[in-house]
Amino acid sequence: MERVRIFDTTLRDGEQSPGVSLNAMEKLQIARQLQKLGVDVIEAGFPITSPGDKEAVSLIAREVKGVVVAALARASALDIETAWDAIKDAESPRIHTFIATSDIHLKYKLKMDRETVVERAVAAVKLAKKFTADVEFSAEDASRSDLDFLCRVVEAAVKAGATTINIPDTVGYAEPEEFGEFICKILEKVPVMDRAVLSVHCHDDLGLAVANSLAAIKNGARQVECTINGIGERAGNCSLEEIVMALYTRKDVLPFYTGIKTEEIYRTSKLVSNLTGMPVQPNKAIVGKNAFSHESGIHQDGVLKERTTYEIMNPRLVGIPESRLVLGKHSGRHALKERLLELGYELTEEQLNEAFVKFKALADKKKEVTDQDLEAMMEEEIRKVPETYTLDYFHISTGSTIIPTATVGLIKEGEKLEDAATGDGPVDAIYKAINKITGLTPVLEQYSINAVTSGEDALGEVVVKLKNGLGKIVTGRGVSTDILEASAKAYLNGINKLLFDYQAKGEKQ
């Protein structure tokens, strides 16, 4: 069997999803988990776009080992030099440079003729090659490009030194049979392709990104660019978990393998969902909460008799745990440690002590603590940034005949701070009181409530998106059995993220 390389672009293309904004530490957390997952390449970002993105790419390049770290750059000297400056400390650095090749892009975006595009592509690859031996070249909008011209550009890029050639379906226009044939023709028409790996990057505008990627693999592509949960521009990208599990499950027709540790898929999906603020749809293949659920009586009967009647893969294969322990207020540290280990959380003694305190507080409010409760508890810790403010208490006065009023107490560097405010509702009143204490007035872009568990004592999760005066958007989360407390914690989590960014960059509100 031949190996297919997995190029993860969650931190670059995935972060281009509307409303997603990750800080450097959040990107580093995801990059570390991607390395643990076993991806071959992490595209850490597009350094020229902002100082913050360059800083995040540099951080990942320095800290994450055992994986290729790539930076994106347009076919321009400044982009390529900036990309190299960001990844120069990586153990295995890659410069990924690109230029569009379709006539529509040449005419309306680049305003270049074909000769100039070929020259720019060659110059970009040659410059990148001066910095690193690992250079990837992408022909943007390749699937809508004239095949003969595309092959000319590809051949020129390989001769200039590109070691990977990427063929993007940038706008998700391709159809699987057509795209597979397209890949086959490129390999036939470009005699020097034996010097480079052929890669594909498919978007999901028609819901065909995974199908197109599989068709490309069947026809000679040996690298697939994808994202966790399929996030990305517009309708998203090829989903890493779907392409990997398709290759794993259907070896009879897809005789290929990847280096992915499949048992890390679920945890990686949860981490990306939580840090980006993009919930996974319940019916999402592989990682959705309904992916291994059976409601039909006939299906339930079949699964109870023999799992393979209605399941083509075991949920444990992708890291979805099967609960064997029921935890409650009488459960001890050892039981908690064992269950967290089964869920994929390896804790130090100090971390276990902190987790146990939170667990006991949660167990006092609930009869049984489920896996979902534990995951929510741990993910709240994962999302933490250094806390300028912590929630001490809040009091609410509200009713059908009175104006909602909130009194909020926060702690900053050991000092207790308190203020009160009225609002259009109890949540609005809490947020206005927090604003008065902190002196910040971010715009609340989004507020949503999700049930983490079911039942009367269910945990509720509140997700907020806050935007500061500079246009920076952060995601805040809070979890509690009390939805007002969850709302306060989510807003404060967002406030602390904004303050963390200000301090890191020396900015002012």
Curated annotation (Swiss-Prot):
Its gene? Answer: leuA
Query: GO CC annotations?
Result: cytoplasm
The protein depicted here goes by the name 2-isopropylmalate synthase
Q: Where are the transmembrane segments?
A: none
How is the quaternary structure described? Homodimer.
**CDD domains on file:** DRE_TIM_IPMS
Q: Where does Mn(2+) bind?
A: 13, 201, 203, 237
Q: Which InterPro entries match?
A: 2-IPM_HCS-like, 2-isopropylmalate_synth_dimer, AIPM/Hcit_synth_CS, Aldolase_TIM, LeuA/HCS_post-cat, LeuA_allosteric_dom_sf, LeuA_bact_synth, PYR_CT
What this protein needs as a cofactor is: Mn(2+)
Residue ranges annotated for the Pyruvate carboxyltransferase domain, each copy included: 4-266
From what organism does this protein derive? Carboxydothermus hydrogenoformans (strain ATCC BAA-161 / DSM 6008 / Z-2901)
GO MF terms, alphabetically ordered: 2-isopropylmalate synthase activity; acetyl-CoA C-acetyltransferase activity; manganese ion binding
Catalyses which reaction?
3-methyl-2-oxobutanoate + acetyl-CoA + H2O = (2S)-2-isopropylmalate + CoA + H(+)
Please report which protein family the annotation says this sequence is part of. Belongs to the alpha-IPM synthase/homocitrate synthase family. LeuA type 1 subfamily.
Per UniProt, which keywords does this protein have? Amino-acid biosynthesis, Branched-chain amino acid biosynthesis, Cytoplasm, Leucine biosynthesis, Manganese, Metal-binding, Transferase
Q: Which PROSITE patterns match?
A: AIPM_HOMOCIT_SYNTH_1, AIPM_HOMOCIT_SYNTH_2, PYR_CT
